[in-house]
Amino acid sequence: MDLILNRMDYLQVGVTSQKTMKLIPASRHRATQKVVIGDHDGVVMCFGMKKGEAAAVFKTLPGPKIARLELGGVINTPQEKIFIAAASEIRGFTKRGKQFLSFETNLTESIKAMHISGSDLFLSASYIYNHYCDCKDQHYYLSGDKINDVICLPVERLSRITPVLACQDRVLRVLQGSDVMYAVEVPGPPTVLALHNGNGGDSGEDLLFGTSDGKLALIQITTSKPVRKWEIQNEKKRGGILCIDSFDIVGDGVKDLLVGRDDGMVEVYSFDNANEPVLRFDQMLSESVTSIQGGCVGKDSYDEIVVSTYSGWVTGLTTEPIHKESGPGEELKINQEMQNKISSLRNELEHLQYKVLQERENYQQSSQSSKAKSAVPSFGINDKFTLNKDDASYSLILEVQTAIDNVLIQSDVPIDLLDVDKNSAVVSFSSCDSESNDNFLLATYRCQADTTRLELKIRSIEGQYGTLQAYVTPRIQPKTCQVRQYHIKPLSLHQRTHFIDHDRPMNTLTLTGQFSFAEVHSWVVFCLPEVPEKPPAGECVTFYFQNTFLDTQLESTYRKGEGVFKSDNISTISILKDVLSKEATKRKINLNISYEINEVSVKHTLKLIHPKLEYQLLLAKKVQLIDALKELQIHEGNTNFLIPEYHCILEEADHLQEEYKKQPAHLERLYGMITDLFIDKFKFKGTNVKTKVPLLLEILDSYDQNALISFFDAA
């Protein structure tokens, strides 16, 4: 059965954060529900639909930005009390809008996530978790990395309090009191947690989580260990998951899974006989989906998925059909309803046009006044700069609450801009004088009308580090622009991982000297992505990384006065040696640097590069042949005389050209890495082999793996 849902936009509030919209439970089954939402202006608004119009139940005065909104109440009763987290304060409202709670937590950081279960309140700021009962402090935990979400397994079903933290270092931490009972390693940084079926599933221990790289999974949190149930990979390369809900939208008696992503995608998964999720419906909205819930808002008896978006739109995807079939005599009634709606919209439009004219006149008068001061309009930007493991590129996502006019990208390090299918903006490049002003890239993206979200893909070169800047100009008057900066790190293509292969041939770099644990940690933060800014607890720490481009690995272990870095790639060790010695020199710290080079690792790295290089050379060769083969096809009329390999190239011509276009300079990047490997191998021996690089490039042009390995050995 196909699921058909029709979109209805209800109203727009201010910019919203993740998980800040809820539906208040209805008094009877499938009756219309009220929507409550909190925004960045600090306003909490509750509204319901009457005769197709949004009617406010209550609206609070502006205040600090609302980071979370949850519903609570006595356990096993309807959860209809509204709780909001703003700055370090929790406020509670009844469903009529009367404030009954104001609780100042005195946290040093702003609250980022909240969960409520009866009289228990679970809060997390960036690194700190707190548990309160009846507003009294119960438990506390300091996390090693940022906490993205917090939840507690249902107390009414398990008779124990089991909070779970979703942490940026790809770990779910299961707590007991103030201690970690156990940690669950997950495939990506978890961004959102939700109880399966809204109640923890059959066992009460089933927990859903979504990751920033778009994976979705179900896990059972038992008292002793986690049990993994299923995991959905992000094969369609969709956005990160921001919100999850369980609701029977299909109407088969089994709750479906509702998912909202940061690229605007709304998905519905049903469960098959084996309890595995199957995608039943998806729809793309134009901006990120911050909250999602199933219920009934627009009309009695019509179920719908209600979502809120970044810019504050509350939208319903409803089962109510747009085209209704009517019996005799009913036609007039439907027409009358439609006429009323059209008339109401017309009046609203006229009122807005009149208001715009008035404001324009006021602006003209005030701008001619000698006392007038020009005010720069403020606007919010939701941005995300993340490394994609699949293609070793960075995604830069810029989302603005109003339409974007243009975005200027400037970089002081060499980077490649890659093609993005979803991107409809027109890009133009300006010539740069990199020697005189450190500009390696100047590109302008001009957006089409009403574009509020822009996605770019960037590939950096390891060893070259600096800053990427985005100048975002929206379509507002007077013209104004915001600048966002993103650091390209020396080992920018490395990603945190839970395990590495210790049997690989490793090169070792050891640093010793008079430096503190915090200082060596700050150097590692400077060099590598996905390392927490605060030094972890304890005297010694180990991080594992994988190079997303080459699949080489890095182990980093450090403590006060000592740092040990191991990698199967000599170039990684060389970059670390150069950057760390430069950072130590800046701080006037004497470093003793020693290294052990494993000759076998060079051959091992070349073998890792081999399949990638071979594939890219073959792709380039095929693309070069396409034009000649097409010309032959036109001249000869048919291609029966061609060998099967050439037939295949002609048939796949469009796909091959698209793939080649998506990966500009891929071959040059691989050549560059092999050249760096060659130079670095001999640099550690104290030999300069730069004069032999032209010979190496000749060998690469007529590539043969054995010849290349022999050249490395003979040089």
Swiss-Prot record:
Keyword Endoplasmic reticulum: no
Protein localization: Cell projection, Cilium membrane; Cytoplasm; Cytoplasm, Cytoskeleton, Microtubule organizing center, Centrosome, Centriolar satellite; Cytoplasm, Cytoskeleton, Cilium basal body
SUPFAM superfamilies: WD40 repeat-like
Molecular function, one GO term: RNA polymerase II-specific DNA-binding transcription factor binding
A GO-annotated cellular component: cytosol
Pfam families registered for this protein in UniProt: BBS7_GAE, BBS7_hp, BBS7_pf, Beta-prop_BBS7
InterPro entries in the record: Bardet-Biedl_syndrome_7_prot (IPR016575), BBS7_GAE_dom (IPR056334), BBS7_hairpin (IPR056335), BBS7_pf_dom (IPR056333), Beta-prop_BBS7 (IPR056332), WD40/YVTN_repeat-like_dom_sf (IPR015943), WD40_repeat_dom_sf (IPR036322)
Entry keyword set: Acetylation, Bardet-Biedl syndrome, Cell membrane, Cell projection, Ciliopathy, Cilium, Cilium biogenesis/degradation, Cytoplasm, Cytoskeleton, Disease variant, Intellectual disability, Membrane, Obesity, Protein transport, Sensory transduction, Transport, Vision
Cross-referenced Gene3D superfamilies: YVTN repeat-like/Quinoprotein amine dehydrogenase (2.130.10.10)
Disease implication from the record: Ciliary dysfunction leads to a broad spectrum of disorders, collectively termed ciliopathies. Overlapping clinical features include retinal degeneration, renal cystic disease, skeletal abnormalities, fibrosis of various organ, and a complex range of anatomical and functional defects of the central and peripheral nervous system. The ciliopathy range of diseases includes Meckel-Gruber syndrome, Bardet-Biedl syndrome, Joubert syndrome, nephronophtisis, Senior-Loken syndrome, and Jeune asphyxiating thoracic dystrophy among others. Bardet-Biedl syndrome 7: A syndrome characterized by usually severe pigmentary retinopathy, early-onset obesity, polydactyly, hypogenitalism, renal malformation and intellectual disability. Secondary features include diabetes mellitus, hypertension and congenital heart disease. Bardet-Biedl syndrome inheritance is autosomal recessive, but three mutated alleles (two at one locus, and a third at a second locus) may be required for clinical manifestation of some forms of the disease.
Name of the protein in question: BBSome complex member BBS7
Record organism: Homo sapiens
Gene: BBS7
